[in-house]
Amino acid sequence: MKSLEYLTETGIKCLKCDEGAIIKVRSDVYCKQCYLRFIRGKQRKQMSSDKYKVKYLRDGASHSTEKVLLAFSGGVSSLVLLDVLARLLEEQKNTHRDLQGFELVVANISESDGTNLESLLSSSSIMQTLLELVGNYEVSIKVKVVTPNIDPVFLRRIGVDYEFNTFANNLSIEEQSVSSLAEILRASPNRSSSEDLRDVIFHQELLRLAQSEGCGTIVYGHSMSRLAIEVLALTVKGRGSNVHSTILDRVEDYCGDQISIIYPFRDLFEYELREYAVLSDLMQYESAFAKYAVPKSKVSKNMTVREILSMYLDRWDESGYLSTASTVVKIGEKLTVPTSQNNSSTYCCDICAKKIYQDPKDWLQMITVNEPAPLVSDEERDYLHQYLTSHTDTISKSGEHVNLCYGCITAINGAGGDSGVIWPLQKDVKFDHGEKEKAKVLKEYSLE
């Protein structure tokens, strides 16, 4: 039995008022307006801090209003979060004489390459649709559409050899023309690895954008269902040590600035957000933004880890076991910071900037058999000779050593194979807090 039911019987009263109920969720029945208030109440609970509330100041006093950056993907959850935040701002404005508790900036990171007319038109169309959407609200909302293009100065060819040593080499003259994130990801034969590396860049870009816009908070529309997928996906991709720091509301330090990361819908399931979108007439925009999203594979072997887990979670709903997602998230929230091996000092991954608590090279060498079985027959020796003459090691071991976590080693092996991948190194970005804009690894192309 599914978790959401439409009521066909007449005479059933809403749990909160005397209006006729139309929907049953979590064993409770709601009318349309009460259900919308139920969803909005969940967001307000997660963002109940005073910095998001209207402040009355004495004459002559000054106060800087909190700015909130909404990570907007165009999916159902981000559409609902935009609507909920905009409705909250409208309520604050009407109740408190045009005062607002915070300012809202909606940021969409376009996955087009930004190098040809078609991709530029795609970014322009996203901007137009977003402007049309925010125009429905009686509050001022800033919109930014950004295409992350990587400065070639910071790009390296990163490779991993059979002993799990990691190297970074300068690009050849032919490779220095690469500047688009889309170009780099298209070269990867493994969609899961591409998705993993893309997430790293997107998160860094959101932090950079929040800093440049003066935002002290980034909000994601992730539901409990999505957070459960993240817990499982991080574990599968070898990033289990990051679970505790990924799904919790937290504060991240970015170039000296403290930025809060919040998931206002962490107590709601995906189907509950989708029903809100249906009742609020937001699904038309979901269809409009879907045209510009990266298409999902329908073939199981080509699906990313996240796509497979999403399909798996849908089956939980159909079988009536969706509450398992809540259990997964609660277990993930209880995880703590890992301890370093033998009390050794921690260091950061040069790709994702996450802390490394145990050397992944030692672990991989311990669980991997690198020595072959002894050759017995002439046929086996002939096969070995054919392999050695045909196989060339394309990874240059003359480059500098780089520190990579287990997840990034796995992603690079999946994305680049024997030749490695072209990718920026976090340690190459030296930020001067006085002149931060001169040291951007990601160049911003924004349409306003």
UniProtKB/Swiss-Prot annotation:
InterPro entries: CTU2, Rossmann-like_a/b/a_fold. SUPFAM superfamilies: Adenine nucleotide alpha hydrolases-like. GO terms for biological process: protein urmylation; tRNA thio-modification; tRNA wobble position uridine thiolation; tRNA wobble uridine modification. Pathway: tRNA modification; 5-methoxycarbonylmethyl-2-thiouridine-tRNA biosynthesis. Keywords: Cytoplasm, tRNA processing. One of its GO terms (molecular function) is tRNA binding. Its main location: cytoplasm. One of its GO terms (cellular component) is cytosol. It comes from the Eukaryota. The keyword Cytoplasm applies. Pfam families: CTU2. It is found in: Cytoplasm. Plays a central role in 2-thiolation of mcm(5)S(2)U at tRNA wobble positions of tRNA(Lys), tRNA(Glu) and tRNA(Gln). May act by forming a heterodimer with NCS6 that ligates sulfur from thiocarboxylated URM1 onto the uridine of tRNAs at wobble position. Prior mcm(5) tRNA modification by the elongator complex is required for 2-thiolation. May also be involved in protein urmylation. Belongs to the CTU2/NCS2 family. This is Cytoplasmic tRNA 2-thiolation protein 2. It comes from Lodderomyces elongisporus (strain ATCC 11503 / CBS 2605 / JCM 1781 / NBRC 1676 / NRRL YB-4239). The gene is NCS2.
